[in-house]
């Protein structure tokens, strides 16, 4: 007995749509907020990689609904961004219209897959009603002193006509290029908006301890924040004070030189005339190097001597001052005291330029840098001390003598928050005649609809060309609008709250209203957040920062927005490589749904392996999923049902319900499917009618993976839709004691097969069953049986000649 997946999908999509089946309920005291990282609506539509994460959250959401939870499972669009703007520049199309068309495609595909999103909660970051709240949040940040307009060194891409964030840049041949298009990127000073995320560094660090996140993601954030405590020391160079930050003041006797970053403000001031040209050339070369390249410890060290010497503030010894790009201006003071005997990078640098190496920690070799623990040596008053004691002693001396102070530093930089683009949220900011800043409270400030969105050529955004929009007169005073726009990460930093505020498609209640507070208390935090690991130190950090600020303002009810985070693995191409148009290995879900059906695709991707594993696409695996769904369908449709339980399936059914429930809770979706297969196999082996509640319970469990076939089978079993409104099956612990045993079947003492029988099956019956097994028949056919041994509940052994 077969079925047409196309007919079933059409039928149930229509039913769900007409009956608003997926609408969020508010009837339970239990809630589950299940969230996908929302996509950028590109022209390509969703791919099978999207399907993996989205299916996982859909399975989990359906499971929670059937367990009596109010479930918020929404979807929206990270709609602003450079790709739409670049497409518009190439084609002459409006990026807003282009994005809206892409959203239609995405939405069609998501419905095609049977995902149970509540599209009454749909959002788009590019909708004015949405970015009205983004602008409101910016105003609160400004009022709290967390938003500032200042001159900063930025990553400038001339080809794209905009500033790029570090996570929008890649390294190619040691140089910085844009991730999109691989255009050259250079450093330049520009006036930009920045958000002072550094003021929340400690809280963001401490908050990680509360979270049910993968430890690797938490470590990425800890390292990105990069908190370190130490001492800031003053080295004198030609009477110019050069502060140096160190966490190892105990090694001060081992300093052989100091190194300044090429961008350090004092480099040219301390360089001798003889070295000036060489230093200037080096600085220019360093400007085009990526930070990734400069941090790469495998790359050969480069540098140049300034010609000057610094005075060690404790020993008064003169040491050379060098400039090298392995020192970064944006960490610490942009200057380091080099102790090559006990630092790998300093050792390589000193070796290359033939600089002195002084060992000040006891060790057994002088052929490489010793970075381990040991007693202090060659250090006068510190000799014999351990690291902790020596640090305490030297810190006290530095503070008392006035050339040092305790300092805490962070690698985390303030968030560069403006872009020279058209397609982004406008800032709600006006500049007066004397450049004084006035916030616009009447929101939203909407983007103008214009055809010419080409870069201004001046470093300003294309909005600078729209004079009628830029220039504003209020009460006779002329103002000029801020022409930069916010980065794409602005809208994604609070979108998890937007779903809660949504009242119909892109309609929102006020974020600071009493109703909003009530809703936040109901739904926050997000209980399960699924998305890619690539967002670990961008979006996830920014969203946590904004949530902390909104918590401080009394808007949100919790400090941390995402309780549990899970990073799904990738779906690789059949060749094992990452799917890419250039490789020609991209799999389009539209094609798969057409040939195999949405349920088969969902089931296959969940059964491939653990959710966090990256695995290659397999057509054979997809075919197997389709065959199994048909096998399950036939089982339900052809099995004779009874309301009288013969108890023979008690153990297997209750064991499967227990295991599937536990596995779904722990996101082990693949092993839960294996349990469903066990039940199907057991029913096919069962003789006689099957207890109806067990078949119905199976269909409920199947439906969270395969919702189309689940609905169809539920209806054919005589029930009114929708199966999503049914209660999840409950196992009976008293029936988890098996009434069957597995009997080993041996030929001449060697295991040849096994059979499952009821406990206590008598010897003669065991022998009869054993001789009916095909694998045993092949051994005993035309052979003389010398002896037959049968042990109840254990073994059958047939001895042949």
Swiss-Prot record:
Cystine pairings recorded for this chain: none
Residues where ATP binds: 581
Keyword Aminoacyl-tRNA synthetase: yes
Pfam families: Anticodon_1 (PF08264), tRNA-synt_1 (PF00133), tRNA-synt_1_2 (PF13603)
Keyword terms: Aminoacyl-tRNA synthetase, ATP-binding, Cytoplasm, Ligase, Nucleotide-binding, Protein biosynthesis
Enzyme class: ligase
Any single biological process term in GO: leucyl-tRNA aminoacylation
Main location: cytoplasm
Catalytic activity: tRNA(Leu) + L-leucine + ATP = L-leucyl-tRNA(Leu) + AMP + diphosphate
Gene Ontology MF terms in the entry: aminoacyl-tRNA deacylase activity; ATP binding; leucine-tRNA ligase activity
Localisation: Cytoplasm
EC number from the UniProt entry: 6.1.1.4
SUPFAM superfamilies (alphabetical): Anticodon-binding domain of a subclass of class I aminoacyl-tRNA synthetases, Nucleotidylyl transferase, ValRS/IleRS/LeuRS editing domain
Keyword Protein biosynthesis recorded: yes
InterPro entries: aa-tRNA-synth_I_CS, aa-tRNA-synth_Ia, Leu-tRNA-ligase, Leu_tRNA-synth_edit, M/V/L/I-tRNA-synth_anticd-bd, Rossmann-like_a/b/a_fold, tRNAsynth_Ia_anticodon-bd, Val/Leu/Ile-tRNA-synth_edit
Gene Ontology CC annotations of this record: cytosol
Residue numbers covered by motif 'KMSKS' region: 578-582
Family statement: Belongs to the class-I aminoacyl-tRNA synthetase family.
Official protein name in the record: Leucine--tRNA ligase
């Amino acid at each position: 007995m077969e079925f047409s997946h196309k007919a079933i999908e059409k039928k149930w999509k229509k039913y769900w749509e007409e009956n608003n089946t997926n609408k969020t309920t508010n009837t339970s005291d239990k809630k589950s907020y299940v969230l996908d990282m929302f996509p950028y609506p590109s022209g390509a539509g969703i791919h099978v990689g999207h399907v993996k994460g989205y299916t996982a959250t859909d399975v989990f959401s359906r499971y929670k609904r059937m367990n009596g939870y109010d479930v918020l499972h929404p979807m929206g669009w990270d709609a602003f961004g450079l790709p739409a703007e670049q497409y518009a520049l190439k084609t002459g199309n409006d990026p807003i219209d282009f994005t809206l068309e892409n959203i239609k495609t995405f939405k069609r595909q998501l419905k095609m897959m049977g995902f149970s999103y509540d599209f009454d909660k749909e959002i788009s970051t590019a909708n004015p009603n949405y970015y009205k709240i983004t602008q409101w949040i910016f105003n609160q940040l400004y009022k709290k002193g967390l938003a500032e307009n200042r001159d900063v060194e930025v990553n400038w891409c001339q080809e794209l006509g905009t500033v790029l964030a570090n996570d929008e840049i890649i390294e190619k041949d040691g140089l910085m290029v844009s991730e999109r298009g691989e255009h050259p990127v250079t450093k330049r000073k520009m006036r930009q908006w920045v958000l002072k995320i550094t003021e929340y560094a400690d809280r963001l660090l401490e908050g990680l301890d509360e979270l049910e996140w993968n430890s690797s993601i938490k470590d990425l954030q800890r390292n990105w924040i990069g908190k370190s405590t130490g001492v800031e020391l003053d080295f004198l160079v030609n009477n110019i004070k050069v502060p140096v930050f160190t966490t190892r003041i105990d090694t001060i006797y081992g300093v052989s030189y100091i190194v300044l970053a090429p961008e350090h403000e004092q480099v040219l001031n301390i360089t001798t005339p003889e070295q000036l040209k060489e230093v200037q050339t080096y600085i220019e070369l360093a400007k085009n190097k990526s930070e990734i390249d400069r941090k790469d410890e495998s790359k050969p060290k480069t540098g140049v001597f300034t010609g000057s010497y610094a005075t060690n503030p404790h020993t008064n010894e003169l040491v050379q001052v060098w400039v090298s790009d392995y020192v970064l201006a944006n960490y610490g003071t942009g200057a380091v005291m080099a102790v090559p005997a006990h630092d790998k990078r300093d050792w390589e640098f000193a070796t290359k330029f033939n600089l002195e190496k002084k060992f000040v920690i006891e060790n057994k070799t002088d052929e490489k840098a010793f970075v381990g623990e040991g007693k202090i040596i060659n250090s006068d008053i510190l000799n014999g001390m351990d690291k902790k004691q020596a640090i305490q002693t030297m810190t006290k001396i530095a503070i008392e003598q006035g050339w040092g102070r305790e300092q805490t530093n962070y690698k985390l930089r303030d968030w560069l928050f403006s872009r020279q683009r058209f397609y982004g949220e406008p800032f709600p900011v006006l500049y007066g005649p004397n450049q004084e800043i006035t916030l616009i409270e009447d929101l939203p400030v909407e983007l103008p609809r214009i055809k010419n969105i080409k870069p201004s050529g001046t470093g300003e955004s294309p909005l600078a060309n729209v004079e009628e929009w830029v220039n504003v007169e209020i009460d006779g005073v002329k103002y000029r609008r801020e022409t930069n726009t916010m980065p794409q990460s602005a809208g994604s930093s609070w979108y998890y709250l937007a779903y809660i505020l949504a009242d119909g498609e892109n309609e929102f209640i006020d974020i600071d209203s009493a109703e909003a507070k009530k809703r936040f208390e109901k739904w926050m935090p997000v209980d399960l957040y699924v998305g890619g690991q690539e967002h670990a130190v961008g979006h996830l950090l920014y969203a946590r920062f904004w949530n902390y600020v909104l918590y401080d303002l009394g808007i949100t009810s919790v400090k941390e927005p995402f309780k549990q985070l899970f990073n799904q693995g990738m779906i690789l191409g059949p060749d094992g490589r990452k799917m890419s148009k250039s490789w020609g290995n991209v799999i389009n879900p539209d094609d798969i749904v057409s040939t195999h059906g949405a349920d088969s695709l969902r089931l296959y991707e969940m059964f491939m392996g653990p959710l966090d594993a990256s695995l290659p696409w397999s057509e054979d695996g997809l075919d197997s999923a389709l065959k199994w769904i048909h096998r399950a369908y036939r089982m339900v449709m052809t099995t004779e049902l009874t309301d009288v339980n013969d108890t023979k399936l008690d153990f297997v059914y209750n064991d499967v319900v227990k295991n599937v429930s536990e596995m779904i809770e722990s996101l082990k979706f693949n092993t839960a499917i294996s349990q469903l297969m066990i039940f199907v196999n057991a029913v096919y082996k069962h003789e006689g009618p099957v207890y109806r509640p067990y078949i119905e319970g199976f269909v409920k469990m199947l439906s969270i993976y395969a919702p189309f076939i689940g609905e169809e089978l539920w209806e054919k079993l005589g029930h009114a839709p929708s199966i999503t409104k049914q209660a999840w099956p409950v196992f009976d612990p008293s029936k988890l004691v098996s009434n069957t045993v597995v009997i080993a079947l041996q030929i001449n003492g060697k295991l040849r097969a096994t059979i499952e029988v009821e406990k206590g099956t008598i010897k003669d019956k065991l022998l009869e069953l054993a001789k009916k097994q095909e694998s045993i028949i092949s051994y005993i056919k035309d052979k003389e049986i010398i002896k037959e041994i049968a042990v109840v509940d254990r073994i059958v052994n047939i001895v042949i000649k």
